[in-house]
């Protein structure tokens, strides 16, 4: 670490955020590598170090002898103030070197409210914010992550954008950048070659135009760019790179544990869930792979907790065999095994028995809506009876606390649906005391977490209006009034942040200037309540001549061109339209293992997809 940085660390809170040198961090001789890659997480160290994707791609890049990948996080206010006052640019943790001198600077876009942090970090690094102002080959500024499925609001700031999964595309891009650097190619030549890589989008090669009513007229390809850009996908999770060690922090982070990803994708088709569609098709790891990788992580990190990661852990086709294998050694070695993302409808007696053998923590389930009508609208395919039966099994197995996830602001929602959330939670409390085997002398705790629904791209609800702040606040008040028991604790999201998230989630390229102006007005850490500056954001919209209501309050007609329609994430637009119509008729769609819904993800040729050449269900009923 440079002495200039050491001096600054004497005056900040949590200096370990910036010191580097943790167990399993990668150090290389920079004179012996060709490429230097700064992997940036646009939030604080504690949040970024918890992110699995960063751990994976950090390992992918550092497995190359020609590349040194280093980590970068958004400095907290105290550190940033000192850095700016002392002219110290943003630096990488491993070397302490300024990232403006690196060959590639990559940002992961995990949530829309981090976009102003990306601009702040580029500015702190001394890197021009707009792609058109960066003339030299390096540094290439790359974005990726789940929010890249609609990158248009940040399109003016990125040279390239990774679509889909990055394990294989990262190496392809680094190979190209190395070749261009060694042969003296220009940035333009690099971009013209990169646009032919599956999963790479070059936004500067697409020109946007708008209709008189403000809707998108066209995104016209230039420079020979493809009309449609297809996401990258890992076809075989057993052969895909996965780290055998994680960097172990010196300080507590949000999720400080070993994490084993057991599969990608989801069979369920919940209509509000973006991840359930953009990560299709489902691709599982074998039990042998899961067991081997989990043991390696525990051995290399010293963690005493292992968390299994997926969109729905209990949907793994070999979940019981997997748990038996893991429990054999985690119980022996006193390792806590954590299973988030459990489904209400497959919480079996066998699963309860296996979970009872590991260290007990609270269970989390997601009914998502309080009434059956609303659950049918969102295609949750879970009944109240299944929720209560599952909670009863848990209580009989010795659990005393349950967390229930819900959403409010869903399409067609009424106050009756909101009251249904409280009523269902009350029935869960009753189920505890009506269970003869419940833990005597212990009170039940039911936590209700209620998120504000935000329509997202590549979901059946991408055309729907977002609920207004006034309506959401009324629903939050009604929920609190409807709670029947003190055993129930309710939490919900602040509505102004939901408004901004909704605008950016489905926004177009014109929002780049709004983000730039918001950053100039001091906006950053927009997901943090103590930093969120609603007035400054509204000022930015006004000065740029754009109305946030245009992006949130109106229902988009099916024929409208959407800002992400030129991107191909596998699931077809026709299928999403059909699912939207079914939602408005309260018609559910069975999950993939019951019957193929013809979503189109089988064309990606990866993983296991039950799709057949023909669409396996009658689609005329909702035309």
Give short role names for the model-derived ranges:
Residues 1-31, 37-39, 484-623:
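Radical SAM enzyme core and accessory elements
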Residues 6-38, 45-46, 203, 209-259, ...:
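N-terminal [4Fe-4S]-dependent radical SAM core
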Residues 66-78:
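A short beta-strand-loop structural module common to alpha/beta enzyme folds
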Residues 75-220, 457-508, 516-531:
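Glycine-rich beta-alpha loop elements in corrinoid/cobalamin-binding modules
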Residues 193-204, 311-316, 340-346, 409, ...:
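A glycine-rich phosphate-binding loop feature that marks nucleotide/adenosyl-phosphate handling sites
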Residues 40, 296-403, 408-447, 455:
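Conserved SAM/AdoMet-binding glycine-rich loop
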Residues 37-43, 61, 247-274, 298, ...:
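N-terminal pre-triad scaffold of radical SAM enzymes
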Residues 51, 252-288, 598-615:
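Canonical Radical SAM [4Fe-4S] cluster-binding loop centered on the CxxxCxxC motif
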């Amino acid at each position: 670490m440079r002495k200039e940085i050491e001096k600054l660390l004497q005056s900040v809170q949590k200096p370990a955020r910036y010191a580097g040198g943790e167990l399993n961090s990668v150090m290389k001789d920079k004179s012996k590598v060709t490429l230097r890659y700064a992997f940036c997480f646009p939030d604080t160290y504690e949040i970024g170090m918890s992110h699995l994707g960063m751990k994976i791609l950090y390992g992918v890049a550092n497995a190359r002898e020609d590349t040194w990948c280093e980590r970068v996080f958004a400095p907290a206010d105290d550190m940033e103030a000192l850095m700016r006052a002392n002219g110290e640019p943003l630096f990488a943790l491993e070397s302490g070197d300024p990232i403006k001198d690196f060959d590639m600077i990559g940002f992961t876009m995990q949530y829309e409210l981090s976009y102003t942090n990306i601009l702040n970090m580029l500015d702190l690094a001394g890197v021009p914010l707009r792609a058109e102002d960066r003339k030299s080959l390096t540094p290439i500024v790359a974005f990726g992550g789940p929010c890249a499925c609609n990158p248009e609001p940040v399109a003016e700031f990125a040279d390239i954008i990774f679509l889909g999964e990055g394990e294989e595309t990262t190496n392809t891009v680094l190979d190209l950048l190395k070749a261009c650097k060694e042969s003296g190619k220009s940035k333009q030549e690099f971009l013209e070659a990169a646009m032919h890589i599956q999963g790479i989008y070059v936004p500067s090669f697409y020109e946007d135009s708008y209709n008189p009513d403000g809707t998108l007229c066209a995104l016209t390809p230039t420079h020979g760019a493809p009309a449609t850009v297809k996401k990258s996908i890992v076809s075989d999770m057993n052969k895909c790179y996965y780290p055998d060690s994680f960097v172990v922090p010196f300080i507590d982070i949000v999720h400080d544990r070993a994490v084993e990803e057991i599969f990608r994708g989801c069979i369920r088709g919940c209509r509000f869930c973006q991840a359930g569609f953009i990560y299709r098709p489902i691709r599982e790891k074998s039990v042998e792979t899961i067991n081997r990788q989990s043991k390696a992580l525990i051995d290399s990190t010293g963690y005493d907790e292992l968390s299994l990661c997926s969109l729905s852990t209990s949907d793994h086709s070999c979940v019981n065999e997997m748990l038996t294998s893991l429990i054999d050694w985690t119980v022996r070695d006193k390792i806590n095994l954590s299973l988030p993302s459990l489904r209400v409808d497959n919480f079996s007696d066998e699963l309860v028995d296996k979970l009872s053998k590991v260290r007990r923590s609270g269970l989390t389930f997601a009914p998502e809506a309080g009434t059956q009508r609303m659950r049918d609208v969102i295609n949750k395919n879970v009944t109240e009876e299944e929720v209560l039966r599952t909670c009863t099994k848990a209580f009989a197995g010795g659990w005393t606390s349950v967390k229930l996830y819900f959403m409010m602001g869903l399409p067609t929602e009424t106050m009756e649906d909101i009251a249904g959330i409280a009523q269902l939670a009350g029935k869960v409390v009753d189920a505890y005391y009506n269970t003869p085997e419940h833990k005597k002398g212990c009170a039940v705790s039911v936590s209700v977490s209620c998120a504000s629904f935000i329509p997202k791209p590549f979901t059946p609800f991408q055309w729907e209006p977002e609920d207004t702040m006034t309506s959401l606040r009324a629903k939050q008040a009604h929920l609190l009034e409807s709670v029947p028991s003190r055993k129930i604790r309710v939490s919900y999201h602040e509505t102004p942040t939901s408004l901004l998230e909704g605008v950016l989630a489905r926004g177009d390229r014109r929002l780049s200037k709004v983000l730039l102006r918001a950053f100039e007005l001091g906006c950053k850490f927009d997901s943090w309540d103590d930093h969120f500056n609603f007035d400054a954001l509204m000022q930015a919209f006004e000065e740029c001549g754009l109305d946030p209501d245009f992006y949130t309050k109106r229902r988009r007609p099916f024929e409208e061109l959407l800002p992400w329609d030129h991107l191909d994430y596998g699931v077809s637009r026709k299928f999403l339209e059909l699912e939207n119509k079914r939602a408005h008729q309260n018609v559910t769609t069975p999950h993939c293992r019951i019957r193929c819904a013809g979503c189109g993800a089988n064309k990606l040729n990866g993983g296991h997809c039950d799709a057949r050449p023909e669409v396996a269900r009658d689609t005329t009923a909702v035309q």
